């Protein structure tokens, strides 16, 4: 190996392109090219930095923080004031990812004026690049107002967790006669100006049909393999969630077990007087 190669001047490998900030236009381009991409939730600086380093292009600061950060049973109780500090941390930790902030229940349903005030606050106070809200035709006016104001909107149809009480629990949406309404919802949010749409717990065949109909990217969670992108709650994805998880979850690691092992070893070494050792002392 030559000295030039060691210092990078004459390497046979192509020079890696510097990473660029992901924009909504990239997602549109990827759909046109048939390039699938991954989205993960994130709720703090350190996790966001790890996911950004891993090349995850889109991070969602979801109202799922209600469950995995604050310990609520559903996403309904979480407030704007509880979400905003989390979004700030994620934005600071992920210089390359597109960061999307969830609008919590009760912060946009009254109409376009309320939705605009809430979304504006999120963008101004956190640095988020886009917002997400739940609903199809019923929130089309809110989406149109935000889009007209220059605020990128990710829509969310199918099973909408904020409506869990009205939907009668965690149930697949869009089966049978309800499929037509799900299609109408997808078209409505696209026409209103959404740059992408999450489809949650929708039959795979229906999600495939909708993905083919839309020009904006679809993001699946429990919606089969043919969406343009996929999203998971990171604690589910990494194996930190304890107990039973949804059918659509695949565990790609066992972070929970490793955390328990490390914490147990730390406690044992402190109790035994092994830690801190000389090399950890000044």
UniProtKB/Swiss-Prot annotation:
Residue numbers annotated as active site: 200
Q: What is its EC number?
A: 2.1.2.11
| Originating organism | Mycobacterium sp. (strain KMS)
- Protein's name in the database: 3-methyl-2-oxobutanoate hydroxymethyltransferase
Co-factor note (free text) = Binds 1 Mg(2+) ion per subunit.
Main location per the UniProt record: cytoplasm
Q: Name one GO cellular component term.
A: cytoplasm
Binding, 3-methyl-2-oxobutanoate = 63-64, 102, 132
């Amino acid at each position: 190996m030559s000295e030039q190669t060691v210092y990078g001047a004459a390497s046979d490998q192509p020079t890696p392109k510097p990473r660029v900030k992901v924009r909504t236009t990239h997602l549109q381009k990827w759909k046109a090219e048939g390039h699938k991409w991954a989205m993960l939730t994130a709720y703090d600086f350190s996790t966001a930095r790890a996911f950004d380093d891993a090349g995850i292009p889109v991070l969602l600061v979801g109202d799922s923080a209600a469950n995995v950060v604050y310990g609520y049973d559903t996403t309904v109780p979480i407030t704007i004031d509880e979400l905003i500090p989390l979004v700030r941390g994620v934005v600071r930790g992920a210089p390359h990812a597109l960061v999307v902030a969830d609008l919590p229940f009760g912060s946009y349903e009254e109409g376009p004026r309320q939705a605009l005030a809430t979304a504006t606050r999120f963008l101004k106070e956190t640095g988020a690049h886009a917002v997400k809200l739940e609903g199809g035709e019923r929130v089309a006016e809110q989406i149109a107002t935000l889009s007209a104001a220059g605020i990128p909107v990710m829509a969310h149809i199918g099973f909408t967790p904020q409506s869990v009480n009205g939907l009668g629990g965690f149930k697949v949406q869009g089966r049978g006669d309800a499929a037509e309404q799900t299609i109408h919802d997808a078209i409505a949010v696209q026409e209103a100006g959404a740059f992408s749409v999450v489809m949650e717990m929708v039959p795979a065949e229906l999600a495939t049909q909708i993905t083919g109909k839309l020009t904006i990217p679809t993001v699946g969670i429990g919606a089969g393999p043919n969406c343009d992108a996929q999203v998971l709650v990171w604690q589910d994805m990494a194996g930190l969630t304890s107990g039973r998880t949804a059918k659509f979850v695949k565990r790609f690691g066992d972070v929970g077990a490793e955390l328990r092992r490390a914490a147990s070893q730390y406690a044992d070494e402190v109790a035994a007087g092994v830690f801190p050792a000389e090399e950890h002392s000044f």
